[in-house]
């Protein structure tokens, strides 16, 4: 899907990949990251976020949780990393990279809670009251206070296989009351995934039903007196989609493939702001023609 795009929009990276592989500088089965292009993309995304009042946590799991790029992004002004699984969070902690949102797709296991919570993430996503209680207990023991993001589910939401879980809207009020009784934690926001996806027929990034679920959950929390909530509305976050996030009332995005210019939107739009920023180098052997 992206080979034509990267050949058209980042020819120097393609030429370098071929040259280095042929000269033995890199081995086959290597991901080659274009540091400068990734940072250019990140700068465009941050500028769009700043202009629209949307804060972005950067996601680097697609490019190996690269700490060098993570440090450059924090130096650029990004608040921190979104770590959808605990291994990514631990990698960032070990490299002194600030944590933004942790646990959105894979909940933090109990054995990793102390190390990750000591790093003081901006917010931690929880699917269940059991996980909220675990975080409350660890924060109480460590003398910390942690904001929690509630992953919410609504009827008709789009969910990927293996990524089910969260608080259904009809149980949200009782869940919030239970969390309000827990020490050292507080509800700080709501999220779902994916809230936006590229639609090939429309040739554009469009909102998913999940977005309305997040909006409804936020309305329910505001009715309970909550203010300054984080509405995290990820997937396909890039310069093009950030105004959509803002228009929907979202406060946060999570650019990942947007940073490398490799969302489906970028494959179909050669005029997109972000350019392809990485390449997979491999060898393909073909039999000679008879």
How would you label these PLM feature ranges?
Residues 154-273:
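Active-site loop/helix belt of alpha/beta enzymes
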Residues 285-290:
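Conserved small/polar residues in nucleotide/adenosyl-binding loops
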Residues 41-45, 52, 56-60:
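N-terminal glycine-rich anion-binding loops that anchor highly charged ligand groups
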